């Protein structure tokens, strides 16, 4: 696995790529892809899709997921996203439901969130790879160290970013974010198991658009 990442990200993350934990992580992931016969997701070229879809300085919103979808052909390197021909997973269905209800718009009926990413939404999982049918199978191998650093770098070097933290894991990242510089929105995960614990009716998307407008940033179309 060679880290092929957009130039502005390479600049801010170069130190991280040279750390010992990251070198061990790369070695482990290479071995996984080589020996697990297509059962590691997403495909290698899409591991850093969230980074390659959005230059660092263009970030407006950060949405933090857990680890990639573990079903075949689902994960595409963007948190909560699937390719357009893939059935929309339940969590993303609930995200669309909240958008439609709160913003009074009709969402596009496909789950490819690249359309959000190119507008400034950084869709990052805390763990960037997974084995088929085994959620959290790549937990604790180094991805969390890396993505924590990514969140800290965004918080430190940018300003007036909206961070959407859904569920306990994402909310645990609050400590990495400077609340004096950014808007932090917290609620339950959009999973069917927890969507009614605050996610539906949270108005996160309304709050996000209001904040972007207040800070003279271009509106994001969440359709």
Curated annotation (Swiss-Prot):
Describe the task this protein carries out.
Excises uracil residues from the DNA which can arise as a result of misincorporation of dUMP residues by DNA polymerase or due to deamination of cytosine.
Q: Where in the cell is it found?
A: Cytoplasm
Q: Does the keyword DNA damage apply?
A: yes
Respond yes or no to whether keyword Cell membrane is given for this record.
no
Family classification: Belongs to the uracil-DNA glycosylase (UDG) superfamily. UNG family.
Q: What gene name is given for the protein in this entry? A: ung
Write out the GO biological process terms: base-excision repair, AP site formation via deaminated base removal
Q: Which UniProt keywords apply?
A: Cytoplasm, DNA damage, DNA repair, Hydrolase
What this protein catalyses is: Hydrolyzes single-stranded DNA or mismatched double-stranded DNA and polynucleotides, releasing free uracil
- Protein name as it appears in the record: Uracil-DNA glycosylase
Q: Which GO terms describe its cellular component?
A: cytoplasm
Please list the residues that make up the active site.
67
Classify the main location. cytoplasm
